[in-house]
Amino acid sequence: MYTSSLRAITIKVLLDNEPFLPGLRLDWGLSILVEGRGGPRLLMDTGSSASRLLGNAEELGVDLANLDGIFISHWHGDHCGGLPGLLDITGSIDVFVPREPGWLMKRELRGKGARLVVLRGPARLVDGFYSTGDLGGEHSLIADVEGLGLAVLTGCSHPGLDLIVRTASSYLRKPVHALIGGFHISSYYEGRKLGTFLAQQGLKVVCPCHCTGSPAKRGLRDVLGDVVLQCGVGMELKLEARGGASKQARGPVG
């Protein structure tokens, strides 16, 4: 299928339960800003607290008042808890969701200007950005980067990363280059098993965070080596085709 790709993207982790840069607030939750060069700006998830999200954004010099959309991976409080407070800043805005929330939450969000866009199947969001569609109550965000392939951002990966990666690749008929987010695994064995699958899929950048345990990260690193990057609050990752390479913020895996 035809897709409009992005020349480059910048990914910034605004909330996570692990640190990367000092002086930022931690949260058992996740929020990641994805910016296309000269193009759309989408925020995936809002963590559990708008005050922590907005505080970190201010500390990092990130303007959340001018987004092109908000992407909620699933309706767990550690991923959507900051949404009502964020809407006080953004005003009327598209909020891409896999399913509608409960009626009380829906009424509150619509009252604050949220235009809930329910994505039951794979779909284009804005130029260069797509959704896997609802995979059992959760969807993942896809960015199509020209010359590299796909960057897939996951909330908690409850549907399983094999399904998420294959759905993204099949929908856009391109390989997945990068995977960032919560992987929902804890043990060393699970990390090695996932690492083997991701190696078979040819991934070049893997950034586990949120609900990915330290033993699982070690298992991933033992299989994938330097493909696995440290992630945490304040981490910034730039993906751009330069002779087939990508520019990354690298660091040791905890």
Question: Predicted regions: what is each one?
Answer:
Residues 2-15, 124-129:
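N-terminal amphipathic/basic leader segments beginning at the initiator methionine
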Residues 9-60, 139-154:
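Conserved beta-strand hairpin/beta-sheet module of binuclear metal-dependent hydrolase folds
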Residues 11-13, 44, 97, 117-118, ...:
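General beta-strand structural signal in soluble alpha/beta enzymes
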Residues 15-18, 46-48, 75, 100-101, ...:
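Active-site metal-binding loops of divalent metal-dependent hydrolases
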Residues 23, 31-35, 117-173:
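Catalytic core of the metallo-beta-lactamase
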Residues 51-96, 169-179, 199, 204:
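Active-site metal-binding motif and surrounding structural segment of the metallo-beta-lactamase
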Residues 79-82, 149-150, 156-237:
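Cap/insert and terminal regions of metallo-dependent hydrolase folds
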Residues 97-140, 146-147, 229-243, 247, ...:
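Metallo-beta-lactamase
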